[in-house]
Amino acid sequence: MVVEAKFESDQGLEGIVRIAEINIENEDGKKEYALEKEVWNKLSDKEYNTNTDEWEKECKLDISRIVGCNIEDVTVY
């Protein structure tokens, strides 16, 4: 699973940042992900996955805190 967030910073920069690659296995077999545990739990939580609006609202807050700028859109694929 990949999570990308469209962002706009206070300095006027904007773009899309890839913030997670989930279920990618290393050579040693360990899975990698680049999200804080709190956000990872929300991605994994069925309640958030079935209620997209609530999931996006909650994740945008956490992701913006991590990335440090305003999040306009979150895409998961």
Pin down the residues of each PLM region:
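Solvent-exposed beta-strand sheet faces enriched in polar/charged residues
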Residues: T75-Y77
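Acidic, low-complexity, intrinsically disordered interaction modules
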Residues: E25-V67
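N-terminal acidic leader/helix
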Residues: M1-W40
